[in-house]
Swiss-Prot record:
Keywords: Chaperone, Cytoplasm, Disulfide bond, Redox-active center, Zinc. The gene is hslO. It is found in: Cytoplasm. This is 33 kDa chaperonin. The keyword Iron does not apply. Belongs to the HSP33 family.
Length: 299
């Protein structure tokens, strides 16, 4: 089944729920970046979180950047997600692998680092982007995003993120967020009930592996709270907007002198997209054409 995002409300629209299945797009990122098991889990969680955060935008061109800079060996983890359902991302050190944690699971927290910062940038596609920064809580990503939502957006939230990786690839990935909206923010009993129910689930990917669907999970959490599942599913996918044309435009920014030096020493130029690992080339005729265009423009 294709990856998708599903929305719901409950408690007379006092609760907002968003769930996303990202199995295929996470495996696409794994293959493109040749990610280790723990790097796959870290980037998969971050991309799912980005899609969930971006789902609140009404502007289709709006995007969210999630950057995690921890003191663990993975280095920077970055995801760029759009309200249109597209997402891309990378891990600075994609081949890092660690032993399982005490529970026998991928040690994402240690790989990310227990200290560091989470940066979130909202870009609506017009005006100036706005950003927030919070310290990492655990490096497990879901807890860090939850802390960001509570401190920077002042929205009580519960977030679950998960990626299950086998030798054959990613077999389950996604996330679920429940938010208590302002109209229900003072209902302490409601908040306590949600927290307990989320805690009882004991993980997101085990539910997917057991054959549970997003509507099933929504029903278990919110079925007795006037649950309203929105009928339209939004397709989500790994997508990068890089292209050969953009690579050539970037080369032109180097200037005529730098391009002449590249032409004389290498006779070609190569660029690898950080987000999708696509490789683009500019051969000698292309470099000569760029130099000619710059020379003409300077006359």
């Amino acid at each position: 089944m294709a990856d998708f995002l599903l929305r719901a409300t409950a408690a007379a629209e006092g609760i907002r729920a968003v769930g996303v299945i990202t199995t295929q797009l996470t495996d696409e990122a794994r293959k493109r970046h040749q990610l280790s098991y723990v790097a796959t889990a870290a980037l998969g969680r971050t991309m799912a979180a980005g899609l969930i955060l971006a789902s609140s935008f009404k502007q289709p061109q709006a995007r969210v950047n999630v950057r995690i800079q921890g003191n663990g060996p993975l280095g920077t983890i970055f995801a760029d997600a759009g309200a249109d359902g597209t997402v891309r991302g990378y891990v600075q050190y994609p081949s890092v692998e660690l032993p399982p944690n005490a529970k026998g699971k991928l040690d994402v927290g240690a790989a990310v680092g227990h200290q560091g910062y989470l940066y979130v940038i909202h870009d609506l596609g017009y005006g100036y982007p706005y950003s927030s920064t919070v310290e990492l809580v655990s490096g497990e990503i879901a807890e860090d995003i939850t802390y960001y939502l509570a401190t920077s957006e002042q929205t009580p939230s519960a977030l679950m993120l998960g990626v299950f990786v086998e030798e054959s690839g990613v077999t389950a990935a996604g996330g679920l967020m429940l938010q208590v909206l302002p109209k229900a923010a003072n209902d302490e009993h409601l908040i306590a009930t949600l927290e307990q129910r989320v805690a009882n689930l004991k993980g997101f990917t085990p539910l997917l592996q057991a054959g549970r669907t997003l509507p099933d999970i929504f029903q278990e959490l919110l079925g007795d709270m006037d649950l309203q599942i929105l009928p339209q599913r939004q397709m989500v996918r790994f997508h990068c907007g890089c292209s050969h044309e953009r690579m050539l435009a970037a080369l032109k920014l180097l200037g005529e002198a730098e391009l002449r030096d590249i032409l004389a020493t290498e006779a070609k130029a190569e660029a690898t997209c950080q987000f999708c690992n696509a490789v683009y080339w500019a051969d000698q005729p292309m470099l000569e054409q760029l130099i000619a265009e710059l020379a003409t423009a300077s006359v």
